[in-house]
């Protein structure tokens, strides 16, 4: 009886193994017949060449670099980030020499500092189109611009503004020439969006105190400077601690952000690459950018963490 039971079990196992083999063979034959490839990652960036993303040397750029990097990585792209490269003049050399493939830039800066155009476009759209045309002439292109724009501006303490009746940049001309000290990065001395433009458009002769970006507010607070070059999306400007002078002659231009990308890289990465970056840019309005800048500058949060939280909240990572 035991032999009979054993024989039945062995026969059953043999049939099961044969069935599995037949099933696997059938599946293989079906795949071969249809030409279906083996299962692969559904992420559009899987298997694409790695890209190198750069950013400049201040808080907003650190956040933008992380936003674009993490969004691309969520889609399967491999991204190497070169952070804190420096000013536009420096990072542009990294781009044109092939050290980086893309970076976020301000449209007005492209026109004034890279294309060396001093004629101001009529509006933000005109500035974007002119900047895009310039970049396409160099083998690059601009992706979509952000809703927010972050322009340079001159800020003063409210007491200083009240004492000297200052509301606009033009009002500084009422003060004795050379009596006003401005705190700004070293490149402010040679930029049209700096001493050159302020002189030609407003007739201002300002003394420059070179400062690393981020130290201008402390210099204002301690009366080391009378006015400072600031960015309009700085977290420090959320309250009423500082007065920002308006720029009626638009020396500081229109400054929406758009990624500059090598056209060769776009071609190699496929349409989802640009779509991913554009989806991030579309969410970056003035309020969102000010909040993220404040989180880093005032609350001392890590830019990578701030970017991660924003992307998650907006369904982008």
PLM features: residue spans?
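Extracytoplasmic "Venus flytrap"
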Residues: 35, 40-66, 83-88, 187-190
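Ligand-binding pocket segment of bilobal, Venus flytrap-like solute-binding proteins
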Residues: 178-248
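A conserved helix-loop-strand patch within extracytoplasmic ligand-binding domains
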Residues: 124-181, 263, 282-286
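Bacterial lipoprotein signal-peptidase II cleavage site
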Residues: 16-32
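Sec-dependent bacterial lipoprotein signal peptides
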Residues: 1-18
